[in-house]
Amino acid sequence: MSVLYHCPHLDESRRPPLPSSYPSSSTSFTPLHSLYFCEECDGVRCNQCVAVEVASYYCPNCLFDVPSANVRGDRNKCNRSCYACPQCATALQIQPTEKMENDQMISGAPYSLICTGCRWSSKTIGWEFDKATGIASQLAKLDPGQAAKTEFEAIKDHLETYMSSSNPEPIRTSSKVPTRHISHLTQMAAKALHRDVPGLAAAKAKGKVRATAGSRSGGLEKAHTKWDELSDYVAKDAWRGGNDSLGIDQLSEMERPEVAALSKRWCSSWGRSSLSSSVLPDRILLHTKLTKRCPHPSCRHLLIQPDAKSVRFKIKMVALNYLPAVEIGRRRRRQDKGPGSTPMAPEEIEQRQRERRRTKAKAGDEEDEEMDKALERGAVYVYQLAFTNPLYDPIQIRLTQPYPPKDAPPINHHVHIPTQHFTVSALKEAWAYDEDDEDDDLPGLEGASEVPSDEGVSTVGGTLGRRNRISTLGTTSSGLREKRARGETGVEKKANMTKVLLEVEVLPDAKGDVTFDLEVRYTYRADAPAPNKEEPTSKSSPNDELKTFTFWVRLNVGKVA
Amino acid sequence: MGAFDPLVTYEKGTYIETDTGNKVSRKAVITGATNIILGGKSIIQSGAVLRGDLRRYTAGQHVVISMGRYCNISEGVVIRPPGKIYKGSFTFYPVRIGDCVTIGQNSVVEAAQIGLGVEIGKDCIIGKFVIIKDLAVILPETVLPEATVVPPMTVWGGNPGQLLDSLPETHQEMVEAKCKGFYSRFRAA
Ligand SMILES: [Zn+2]
Ligand SMILES: [Zn+2]
Ligand SMILES: [Zn+2]
Ligand SMILES: [Zn+2]
C-alpha cells in the first residue's frame, strides 16, 4: 500500500510519466512529504534534482556550530572533545579520576575517555589528559597520525609549487601522451568543465624535459607534449613507521577478537593497527545543514534554507503545502455473481466494465477487508481515496487515469473512477471546523466571501512569501446543488478532506503488484502577479485568475495472491 | 493526513480525563504526582510507570518529570529521572519532555531531555542523562548508552544506538499531525 508522487525532474513537457510497467519510471516517484515545490517554475522538485549547498556545519555530539572557515583545517571533524569509541562508535565521555583524600572523594585529573556503550577506556591505549576540555588539542601532541599528516602536508606543498598558472599550452596532438603530463590533464579538465582549472605551471615545462624521465622513456623529446617540470620528492619517514608492523602470519595466528574488524578500521583517518587492542578513537565527523535550490538553470530559487540555531527553516517550499494529499484506505471487495477463476475474454471484461458503470453498487454488495490482505484474481475492489486540501481556499479536482503509451506492456487490472470531478474545501484553523463538523455543507464551499488574512498564510510551516492560492471556483451554493443533482456517488466530505471511491478490478490472469498511476488536476484561484513580488496581495481582486496544476500519483494497492 | 486511521478506544471509566485534557489510565503507576507536570492533551496509557517520587533531597518543590502537550506514553513505559553521585551524594535530576513526544510500548527512559516531536519506538532503553533533541526518531529496540546526545532531525537505531539517517524537512508537520490525530482518535468506547 503506497501513494507516491511524481517529480518530472525538470522535464517541462508536462507529459504523464511512463506507467509502472516500465521499471525505469519508479525513480520519479517519492512520498509527498519528501518533495519540494518551486513557485517560480510552478513545479514539483525532488531530492534527486534539487541543487544542494552546505549552509552550516555542526558536531552531532556537542552540537557546536563549526564556522565553515575552520572545517577544512579541522578535516571535517569536531576539534573540541568529541571522540567515537573505537569498538562500538558510541561518543566517548570524559571521566575524571576519583580518589579519596581526607575521607572525601575528590575527582580531578588525570582524565580519560570512556565508552558508556561498551566500557572501553582510553587508559588501555595510554591516553590520559590533564584537562577535561579541549581533548583534541591536548591530543594533537601525541596523536600518532601526526607523522602521516606531516608527510601529507609536505607532499601537498611540494606539488603546490606547480599550481600557479591556469593558462596551459594549447593541446598538441600526439600519439605518445605521457601519463604524468599534468598540464595536459589540467587543460583537458578545463575544457570539460568549461572553466579555468588552477593547473600546474605549464610555462615552466615549455621546452624542458626532465632528464631522468627523458632518459628512462627515451625518444620522448621527439613527442610534441612534454613532461612537466617536477622535481623529486623525498619522502619523510612516515611510511616506514606506524604500529601496524604485524605480518599476515602473525595475524592468522591470533584469535578473532584480537584482530580489529575491518568495520572498525575503515573509517579511521590514517592507516592504523590491525590489533583491536590498539585501534584508536577518531574524532567525530561533522554534520551539515543543507540549503536546497530549484535546479532549473534559469530559476535557482531557494526551496530550503535552514536556520543554524533551530529545527525551523527560514525558507521551506515543500509540496505538502501546495498539492492535495492523497491517501488510500477502506478496501471493500465486491461480491460478484460469477466465479473469478475462469479466464474472461477481453470483450467480456469490457462488457462487465460497462455494466458496472451503469449499475451502481447497492449497499450490502460489498464486504470490508483488511488493506494488507493479498488481492484475489478476478475480484473487484472498491477503495476510498482521500484528498486533503492544504490551501486556504477550496479546490476543484479532476481525477483521471493517464493514457498509457502505445506499446506499453499489458496491465493486470482495470481501474474505474466513479466520480471524476469533485471539490475539496479550504483548510481552516481547527476551531473553525468544530462548528461545521456535523455539517456536510461546509460553509467554506459557498465561500467566495472568505478570504484569509496575510498572516494566516505566511505562518504556516514557517513558509515565507507563500503565494496565496485564493480560489472561488464554481463553488457557490448553486454549483454545489448542481453537483448534488448529478449525483456524486460515495463522496464524503469533512473539513478540508474529500473522500471518493475508486474501483480496481484484478484481472483473472494477474500476478504481482497491482500498481497504477492517476492524474490529478486541480483548479485554484491564484493572484495575478503582484507588482511587488515580495508581498503578494491577498485580496481577491478582479485580477485573480483560475489556474490549474496537474500532477501524477502512483498507487500500489497490494499484491495478487 | 491520517484520513483512514481507526479510532483507538478504551473502556469508559478506565481513564481519568483532567481539566487540561490529559487522559491518564487508572492502571498507570504514577508516584509523586505532585512533582509531575503534564502539559495537557497528553495520554498516559495503562501500565506506564512515572517515577515522580525520585526527587532531589533538598528543601523546596522540585519538578521531577515535566511533559508537554500531545504526548503519548504507551503501555508499560517506564520514565524515571536520571541520578548520579554529585559531590559525594547521590542526586536525581529532572526529566524534561517536550510537546508531541511519543514513547512506544515497554521502553525504559532515563533521559534528561527529550525535545519536541521526538518519537521513541517500542522496547527501547534510553540511558541516563541522554539528551534527545527536537524531532529525532529512535527506532524500536534501540539502546542509547548513558549520556548519548541525539541531534535534531536524525534517526537512531541499534545497540548501542548509532545515527542512521536524517529526516525530511517536513517532519515537524508530519509529527504534529500524527500526535494531534492520535489524541483525537483516542476515545472512550
Ligand atoms: Zn526530481
Ligand atoms: Zn524554480
Ligand atoms: Zn563535538
Ligand atoms: Zn564502546
Q: Where in the sequence are the language-model features?
A:
Chain B
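Glycine-rich hexapeptide-repeat left-handed beta-helix
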Residues: P6, K12-Y15, T58-H62, R69, ...
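Well-ordered beta-strand segments characteristic of repetitive beta-sheet solenoids
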Residues: N22, K41-I44, G68-R69, I73, ...
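Extracellular beta-helix/beta-solenoid repeat scaffolds
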Residues: I36, G47-L50, L54-R56, I65, ...
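Gram-negative (and chloroplast) outer-membrane scaffold detector with strong preference
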Residues: G98-V101
